[in-house]
Every structure is written in C-alpha cells, then in structure tokens.
Swiss-Prot record:
Name of encoding gene: mtnA
Enzyme Commission code(s) on record: 5.3.1.23
GO molecular function, one term: S-methyl-5-thioribose-1-phosphate isomerase activity
Organism (species): Leptospira biflexa serovar Patoc (strain Patoc 1 / ATCC 23582 / Paris)
Annotated function: Catalyzes the interconversion of methylthioribose-1-phosphate (MTR-1-P) into methylthioribulose-1-phosphate (MTRu-1-P).
Descriptive protein name: Methylthioribose-1-phosphate isomerase
Matching HAMAP family: Salvage_MtnA (MF_01678)
Site note Transition state stabilizer, residues: 158
Length: 357
C-alpha cells in the first residue's frame, strides 16, 4: 500500500518553503525563501539538492526575482536572472533545460508581472510532471525485478528519493514501487561522503516509511556483495551523455566497478530531462568542485547555535588539503539499464529513445 511522502518544496504564492536538508535528520526545518538571491544560496549550500528538485527550485527562484521587479522588462535583465540561477550548480542538466524553457516561454512578454506569472505557472507544472514521471519510472523499474521473488536486497548511493525530487523519487521511487507491490525490500544505503546524503537522508526517508535499511560506508560494497546476496544497485544521476556515460554523486563510479566485478546489475534511474544529447561522452560533462572544508571538517554540520560540530583540527589536521569533486563519471559499459518514465533501455538505445522526446 502506498505510503505518505515528503513535500520538500512548497510554493506559498509569495515565498518558497524549502525543507532544509542540511539539518536532517536532526530536525525538520523549513526555510522561507523570499528572494532569488536566497534561492541561489539554498541551491549552492545544498539546503535543497537532487537534480529535479534543483531545477524546480531554480524556476521558483527566477519567479521570485521577477516578482521583485516592476514595469517593462528587457532581454538583458531576463538573461541576468537566468544566468545567476544557472551558475548556482552547473553539473545537473535539469536546471539548464528548465531555465532554457523558462526563457523561451517569456519571449515577447514585456512586463515583469506577466513574466512572473508565466514562470510561476511553469514551476508548478514542473512539480506535477516530475511527480508523475517519477511514479511511472518507479513502476517501470519495479517491473524489472522477478515477479516470483518476494524479497530484494538493494544498494543505493546518495539520496534519490522524495527529498531530491517533487515526490516519490527516482532510485528510491523504484524501491517504493516494489514496496507498494507487496515486496519486502532491504536497502543498503551508502553513507555518501562527504555530505552524507545516504546516511542522513536516504536512511531518514526509509525509516520514516518503515522500509528496512542499513547504512554502509562507501568502501563496504565489495564486502557486502561477497557476504550477502545483492539483487541490484540503484542510483540516480545528474547528467547522461549520448553514449551512456553518467555523472552522479562522487563514489558512484567506484560502486559501479564493484557491482560489475560481482555481476550485480547496476541500474541508473533518471527522468528524460537528465539526458543531454548534445554531449557525446562523459568527458564533456562539467564537474563541480566544492569546498575542501566539507571533507576536512564536515562544515555543513552545525549545532543548534550554528557552530561547527567538527571544528578545524577535529577530523583532519589543521591545514590539511582535500579534493572535493561533487560528481564522477560512470562509464556506460558498467550500466545494465537506464530506468526512465519512457521505459527501460540499455545505453546503446539512448539516441533512439530520446531523439524525438
């Protein structure tokens, strides 16, 4: 039976209410986003994250920007709003596609009030479409699993649930759909360093819904595949090139290689907006580099007073350097299938499946 889901993005007509994912699971706190500038900070600082959720939030952000203006618009100012939001997080293609569509929808619209209404309507439309796409994707993915098997053990990476989308989720959407079909699902959630989206967010979502879940460290998947029967690895993604190379949260590539070695099917769950047919291979996907302090002191984790839980020198020597790419590229050869709202298909079929969409 379907369970209630989170609504991490809520539009309140004059402001945007965002569930602050930086403070989960400690507390459920909503940010009241009043301006485009606050939206950009929320995206950049990962109060909201996940490619679909970022895209929706970005369109609400430019809506807020337009609402603060008055009189007649001009193309330069419209482009400025769009450019500022785009630069908040460049890897996920969903945001880029959404902003291009937003620009197209206001061509010939000359008043800021009218532009704000067009963008507000578009953002609300995106929320409905994303939820519907995720629910269809989830069912398509669930149908890949054997009907005569009642229990499945699945590894996930990062957070790909309702918190990362308008609802239901992509990879976690498949898990929810299996649950709704009456199957027992045991989830092994990679903690996903350094931002800990798996241990903080995926485990939180699964526990809220009563789905059995174990947190594992990012280096534990090989041991797990050797010692327990793993039926599949399910991940989301931020951008897919034409050849199937896939950008996703750092650590995905490692997990794909381990799954390949152990003959565990590795599935990428993505809505059509995550496919970028302008890019031939993953080498063309830009990789966002984030702050070193996210690695050396978990600087996104703060106590009630707003102070760092792990001050400098606590988890790494003071002055230690770190690399912090937010994403890596998983080569297409490690991916068994893409699970989408359009159906499930192998990397070689991407051009055929997406060219007329």
């Amino acid at each position: 039976m379907s369970q209630p889901e989170f609504l991490p993005i809520q539009w309140k007509s004059t402001f945007l209410s965002l569930l602050d994912q930086r403070v989960l699971p400690g507390k459920k706190e909503f940010l009241q986003i009043q301006t485009m500038e606050e939206t950009i900070v929320a995206i950049r600082e990962m109060a909201v994250r996940g490619a679909p959720a970022i895209a929706i939030t970005g369109i609400f952000g430019i809506t807020l920007g337009a609402k603060k203006k008055s009189g007649n618009s001009n193309p330069v100012d419209v482009d400025s709003l769009i450019k500022q939001v785009f630069e908040s997080r460049p890897t996920a293609v969903n945001l880029s596609f959404a902003l291009k569509e937003a620009k197209k929808r206001v061509e010939g619209v000359s008043h800021w009030d009218s532009i704000a209404k067009v963008w507000e309507s578009y953002a609300l439309e995106m929320m409905v479409q994303d939820l519907k796409a995720n629910q269809t994707l989830g069912k398509n993915g669930a149908d890949l699993f054997p009907k005569n098997q009642n229990e499945f053990h699945i590894i996930t990476h990062c957070n790909t649930g309702a918190l990362a989308t308008a609802g239901h989720g992509t990879a976690l959407g498949v898990i929810r759909s299996l649950r709704d079909q009456g199957k027992k699902v045991v989830v092994y959630a990679d903690e996903t360093r350094p931002f800990l989206q798996g241990s903080r967010l995926t485990a939180f979502e699964m526990m809220e819904e009563g789905i059995e879940c174990y947190i594992i460290t990012d280096g534990m998947s090989g041991w797990l595949m050797n010692h327990r029967k793993i039926d599949a690895v399910l991940v989301g993604c931020d951008r897919v090139a034409t050849n199937g190379d896939t950008a996703n949260k750092i650590g995905t590539y490692n997990l794909a290689i381990v799954a390949y070695e152990h003959k565990v099917p590795f599935y990428v769950c993505a809505t059509k907006d995550s496919f970028d047919l302008k890019l031939k291979t993953g080498d063309e996907i830009p990789i966002e580099m984030r702050k070193e302090s996210e690695v050396t002191q978990f600087d996104f984790l703060k106590n009630e007073e707003g102070n760092f839980l792990f001050p400098e020198g606590k988890t790494s020597p003071i002055g230690a350097r770190a690399l912090n790419p937010s994403f890596d590229i998983t080569k297409a050869k490690f991916i068994k299938n893409f699970i989408t709202e359009l159906g499930c298909f192998v990397p070689e079929e991407i051009s055929f499946r997406l060219k007329n969409v």
